[in-house]
């Protein structure tokens, strides 16, 4: 940790202390009043997020997929649920709330999925598309329940800045759909706008930096940038774009492989850039050329690492993370990301548009744009793809039945290598989309630490192991 990072962390502690003095002894509703005076004049413009309000290809699911397969219907208003146990997260001040290795409660990552509020945007979309008040009433009930039970900086939903950022993004899309709908209570829209501005104001003061700056920072910057576009706030727009530009080559190798060396986290970051690019294009805002060049390389890498655009061969962690979901239920995340990036780049990749188009994509692009992708000749995938700098090679059998992936990469990004595994020279193999030799992945993040560590160890991967060497370093 260098001197600049130490100074930043000290400044963050000072800021947190000021917030504790202001908010710890009160239950401030995030939607009741603005906490930051400089954002009081901002107004929301629903047309600047790039939604296709003419879309007629939609479903009306109201459930979201929860990490671990938990039943959303049981938990949909259980905002403080521990999930892995019957216990609840405390509603104490978030800076004083420990959430890692709390095995007596559960894995915070599971709870965060519920509090990202994909269901808010989903219900608002359903109401806009059908005018059926049952979706509006359910959205109101969830919104009122959440704001009452989750005052600002109280409880598990406020323990991660990135989680606040994802929630703010989903509130923006929620407000966009409601702004185009009839019979919407004006106070509801005002509360959403106030809540979004408060959350973005908070994120803009606390976004990740230095050794903490990984995929979290990309999502936080995207939230700030999208809010800058949607609220006509030049300060937020400029900040978001500048962070995303600076981080692009810090967090990715020049051949398109993300330095976290986790395919899913690469796609998570790609979604952030793609959503931001799409909104910038909608607003006639100049997109840095390096963004498009790198996103093209990253999309090519993901295409090479998948079987017929349907099944991903994943090395490293996979927590099923996403930023926006207007379809609901359990989605094919690979198809969604590849379709989204193909349309942003105006370049179809092999197999991608042979699959059903994800509904989120239908709400972001017109039928004509999607049709153009279907008619264009897709980019082929080579039978041998080697990403020397990023450290992965993929081999195919010529008939696209067999896919082999070989990991000859570093172990992860930065000093903590948070989402990479000790998987040097490991390989995977699938045939007809079925895994024959698989990476173990990991199923847990913030609890049961011995198992978290076990599934990241070398001996859990398809590679050679020197047990004498391992024992010497344990």
Regions inferred by a protein language model and the residue ranges of each:
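Aromatic-lined, polymer-binding surfaces characteristic
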Residues: 101, 105-295, 306
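Covalent nucleotidyltransferase core used to form phosphodiester bonds in nucleic acids
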Residues: 413-418, 443-458
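Structured loops at beta-to-helix junctions and adjacent beta-edge loops in soluble globular domains
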Residues: 70, 82-85, 100, 206, ...
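Low-complexity, Ser/Thr/Pro/Gly-enriched N-terminal "stalk/linker" regions
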Residues: 59-97
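Extreme N-terminal leader/anchor segments
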Residues: 1-70
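Carbohydrate-active enzyme catalytic cores, enriched for enzymes
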Residues: 261-437
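Conserved small/polar residues in nucleotide/adenosyl-binding loops
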Residues: 468-474
């Amino acid at each position: 940790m260098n001197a600049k990072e130490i100074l930043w962390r000290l400044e963050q502690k000072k800021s947190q202390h000021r917030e504790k003095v202001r908010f710890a002894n009160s239950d401030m509703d995030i939607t009741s009043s603005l906490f930051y005076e400089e954002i009081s004049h901002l107004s929301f413009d629903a047309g600047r997020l790039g939604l296709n309000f003419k879309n007629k290809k939609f479903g009306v699911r109201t459930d979201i997929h929860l990490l671990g397969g938990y039943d959303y219907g049981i938990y949909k208003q259980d905002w403080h649920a521990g999930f892995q146990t019957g216990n609840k997260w405390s509603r104490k001040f978030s800076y004083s709330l420990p959430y890692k290795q709390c095995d007596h409660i559960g894995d915070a990552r599971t709870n965060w999925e519920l509090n990202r509020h994909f269901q808010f945007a989903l219900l608002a979309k359903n109401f806009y598309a059908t005018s059926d008040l049952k979706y509006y009433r359910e959205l109101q009930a969830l919104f009122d329940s959440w704001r009452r039970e989750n005052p600002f900086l109280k409880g598990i939903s406020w323990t991660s800045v990135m989680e606040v950022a994802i929630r703010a993004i989903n509130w923006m899309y929620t407000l966009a759909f409601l702004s185009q709908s009839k019979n919407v209570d004006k106070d509801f829209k005002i509360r959403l706008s106030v809540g979004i501005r408060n959350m973005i104001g908070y994120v803009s003061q606390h976004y990740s930096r230095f050794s903490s700056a990984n995929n979290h920072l990309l999502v936080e910057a995207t939230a700030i940038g999208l809010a800058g576009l949607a609220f006509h706030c030049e300060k937020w727009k400029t900040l978001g774009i500048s962070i995303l530009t600076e981080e692009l080559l810090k967090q990715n190798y020049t051949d398109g492989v993300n330095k976290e060396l986790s395919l899913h986290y690469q796609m998570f970051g790609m979604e952030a850039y793609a959503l931001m690019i799409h909104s910038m294009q909608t607003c006639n805002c100049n997109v840095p050329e390096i963004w498009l060049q790198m996103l093209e390389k990253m999309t090519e890498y993901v295409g090479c690492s998948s079987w017929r655009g349907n099944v991903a061969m994943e090395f490293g962690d996979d927590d099923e993370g996403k930023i926006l979901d207007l379809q609901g239920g359990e989605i094919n995340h690979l198809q969604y990301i590849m379709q989204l990036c193909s349309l942003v780049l105006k370049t179809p990749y092999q197999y991608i548009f042979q699959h059903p188009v994800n509904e989120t994509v239908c709400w972001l692009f017109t039928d004509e744009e999607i049709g153009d992708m279907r008619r264009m000749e897709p980019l082929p995938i080579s039978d041998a793809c080697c990403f020397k700098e990023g450290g992965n090679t993929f081999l195919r059998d010529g008939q696209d039945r067999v896919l082999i992936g070989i990991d000859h990469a570093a172990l992860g990004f930065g000093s903590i290598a948070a989402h990479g595994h000790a998987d040097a020279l490991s390989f995977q193999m699938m045939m007809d989309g079925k895994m024959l030799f698989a990476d173990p992945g990991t199923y847990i993040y913030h609890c049961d630490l011995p198992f978290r560590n076990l599934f990241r160890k070398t001996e859990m991967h398809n590679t050679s192991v020197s047990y004498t060497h391992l024992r010497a370093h344990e």
